[in-house]
Amino acid sequence: MIKTFKFILLFLTGGNLYYLIEILWRGHSHFSMFILGGICFILIGLTNEYFSFEMPLWKQQLISTVIITFMELIAGIILNIWLGLNIWDYSNLKCNLLGQITLQYSILWFFLSLPAIILDDYLRYWLFDEEKPHYRCL
């Protein structure tokens, strides 16, 4: 029961933050971005289940960037291409793939993943008695 509550809380936190970032960046968002944000936040947090805190932060950020970019690509293919919802279209940006992901946003996700990693770690520590976070920079 506690594990279910933990994942619901982390999902809601990530979903709300992702949705808010979209509102601040683009001026609008779509409900699917709430869902995508929640899933990404949980996946970012699960990296500590497979890799230790001894992994340098920049590597955690790199893994998180790959997760977010991959999830954005999958969501874009399903929502924008298959279902035709046209929630976003990066076709006019350089280094895009199918108009769904682009290098410049992947770089942005690298930097935005740092506060997400730290927030997830501390939420798990404060609320669920998980290991106290500690980090290596290099």
Model-based region annotation:
Residues 1-138:
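Aromatic-rich, lipid-facing transmembrane alpha helices and their immediate juxtamembrane interface loops
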